[in-house]
């Protein structure tokens, strides 16, 4: 079981890299003229990971999925996919650039968006499988 969690963690990290590069390319192309340096990709990735974690945990709670599957997906894949340490580093980077308002807003969003997404995941799972 442990090796499966590790394997899924590696797959999650690769998926994060692909999504991160894709979002950054599109975001940088759109904002090249305005010079906006908002770390959108990390926020999106953590939101998606939290949404999926909410769905997975509520699916386990409603006994639609077994614990081994949840462990491989949530701890493995989503553990490799999400990147809250990068989000905190981006807040520190914005502070060092003296972009205090953006750092504060991004710091709040880094906590609020995943919480909202995990709650939405709970709701989606409940709608899909009412108890």
Swiss-Prot record:
One of its GO terms (cellular component) is plasma membrane. Na(+) binds at residues 79, 82. The chain crosses the membrane at residues 38-58, 69-89, 108-128. One of its GO terms (molecular function) is fluoride channel activity. One of its GO terms (biological process) is cellular detoxification of fluoride. It is a multi-pass membrane protein. It is found in: Cell membrane. It catalyses: fluoride(in) = fluoride(out). Na(+) is not transported, but it plays an essential structural role and its presence is essential for fluoride channel function. Pfam families: CRCB. Keywords: Cell membrane, Ion channel, Ion transport, Membrane, Metal-binding, Sodium, Transmembrane, Transmembrane helix, Transport. Belongs to the fluoride channel Fluc/FEX (TC 1.A.43) family. Fluoride-specific ion channel. Important for reducing fluoride concentration in the cell, thus reducing its toxicity. This is Fluoride-specific ion channel FluC 1. The gene is fluC1.
